[in-house]
C-alpha cells in the first residue's frame, strides 16, 4: 500500500529550480502582502465599509488561503532531494484546495450579483445588499466550498494505491492522484468532471450572462455615470477570466496536456492570487485613495512613536 506520494515538480534542472525558488518566493511574498493590504485597507477605512468591499476583502482572504495550500510546499521542495507528501497530507491538500477553490467560485458569483444589483437596480441596492445579506452570502460561500471539498475527498478516500506513487505536479489534486489508483477509474473520472467541471463551467457561464446584462445596461447610461461602473466591472471580469480560465481546462477539458496542466496549475494557484490585488487596486480610485490614507496614517504614527 502507498503511504506517500512523490511530486515530480516543475523541473529537474538544479539551475532552473534555484531560479524558480527565488521567483516563487517573491511571488508568494507579493500574494501575502497584496491580499493582506486589501483586507487591512477595507477594515481600517470607513468609506470602504460597503457590500462590494466586504466581498473583496473576503475574496482576498480566500486567494491568500488558496495559494498557501500549495505555494509554501512548492517553494521548500525546490531544494528537497525527494519531494514527498504523506497520503494523509495529500488528502488534506485536496480538501483545502477544493474548499477554497469552491468558495472562490461562489464569492465571484456573489460579487457579480452585487454589481448587477448596484448597476441594474440601484434604488433597491441598500435593501437587497444589507448587512444580514452579506453575512448570509459568506455563510453560503463557505458552506458550498465545504460541501464541494467533502465530495472531492469522498472520491479519493476509498481508492486503493498499491503501485506507482509519482504525481506529475507540485501538489495533490484529484485528477492527477486518481490516475495512480490500482482500480479502473474511468467512471470516477467522469464523476470528477461532472462535479468540478460542471460546477466550474456553469458558474462561468452564469457570470458571463450576468456581466453581459450589466454591460447592456451601462450602454444606455450617460458616459459620465457609466465610466466608474465600467471601470469596476472591467476589474471583476478580468479576475473572473483569470480564475475560471485555468479551472475550465484543468477540471472540464477531457484531453489534458501535462505541460499545459502544470502551467495552468501555477497560474491558478500562484499567478491569479498575485494579480487580483493589483487589478482591484489599479482599477479602483477608492482603493488607491484609501491605501494612500493608510500610508499617511502609518507614517504619522511612526513619527509620533
Swiss-Prot record:
Name of this protein: Olfactory receptor 4F5
TM segment ranges: 19-42, 51-72, 94-113, 133-151, 189-212, 229-251, 263-282
Function: Odorant receptor.
Protein family membership: Belongs to the G-protein coupled receptor 1 family.
Residues in the Cytoplasmic compartment per record: 43-50, 114-132, 213-228, 283-305
Organism: Homo sapiens (Human)
Membrane topology: Multi-pass membrane protein
Secretion signal, residue range per the UniProt entry: none
Entry's localization field: Cell membrane
InterPro entries registered for this protein in UniProt: GPCR_Rhodpsn, GPCR_Rhodpsn_7TM, Olfact_rcpt, Olfactory_Receptors
Keywords: Cell membrane, Disulfide bond, G-protein coupled receptor, Membrane, Olfaction, Receptor, Sensory transduction, Transducer, Transmembrane, Transmembrane helix
CDD domains cross-referenced by the UniProt entry: 7tmA_OR4-like (cd15226)
Amino acid at each position: 500500500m502507498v503511504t506517500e506520494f512523490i511530486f515530480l515538480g516543475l523541473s529537474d534542472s538544479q539551475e532552473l529550480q534555484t531560479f524558480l525558488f527565488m521567483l516563487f518566493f517573491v511571488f508568494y511574498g507579493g500574494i501575502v502582502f497584496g491580499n493582506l493590504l486589501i483586507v487591512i485597507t477595507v477594515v481600517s477605512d470607513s468609506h470602504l465599509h460597503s457590500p462590494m468591499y466586504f466581498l473583496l476583502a473576503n475574496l482576498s482572504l480566500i486567494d491568500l488561503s488558496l495559494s498557501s495550500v500549495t505555494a509554501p510546499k512548492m517553494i521548500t521542495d525546490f531544494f528537497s532531494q525527494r519531494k514527498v507528501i504523506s497520503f494523509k497530507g495529500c488528502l488534506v491538500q485536496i480538501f483545502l484546495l477544493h474548499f477554497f477553490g469552491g468558495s472562490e467560485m461562489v464569492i465571484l458569483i456573489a460579487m457579480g450579483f452585487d454589481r448587477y444589483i448596484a448597476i441594474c437596480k440601484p434604488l433597491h441596492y441598500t435593501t437587497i445588499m444589507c448587512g444580514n445579506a452579506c453575512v448570509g452570502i459568506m455563510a453560503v460561500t463557505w458552506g458550498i466550498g465545504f460541501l464541494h471539498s467533502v465530495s472531492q475527498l469522498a472520491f479519493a478516500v476509498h481508492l486503493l494505491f498499491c503501485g506507482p506513487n509519482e504525481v506529475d505536479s507540485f501538489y495533490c489534486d484529484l485528477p492527477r492522484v486518481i490516475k495512480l489508483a490500482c482500480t479502473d477509474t474511468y467512471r470516477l473520472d467522469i464523476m470528477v468532471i461532472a462535479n468540478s467541471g460542471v460546477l466550474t463551467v456553469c458558474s462561468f457561464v452564469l457570470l458571463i450572462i450576468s456581466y453581459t446584462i450589466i454591460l447592456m445596461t451601462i450602454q444606455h447610461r450617460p458616459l459620465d455615470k457609466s465610466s466608474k461602473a465600467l471601470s469596476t466591472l472591467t476589474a471583476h471580469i478580468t479576475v473572473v477570466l483569470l480564475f475560471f480560465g485555468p479551472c475550465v481546462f484543468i477540471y472540464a477539458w477531457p484531453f489534458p496536456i501535462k505541460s499545459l496542466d502544470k502551467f495552468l496549475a501555477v497560474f491558478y494557484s500562484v499567478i491569479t492570487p498575485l494579480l487580483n490585488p493589483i487589478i482591484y487596486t489599479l482599477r479602483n480610485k477608492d482603493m488607491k485613495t484609501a491605501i494612500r490614507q493608510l500610508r499617511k496614517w502609518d507614517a504619522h504614527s511612526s513619527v509620533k512613536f
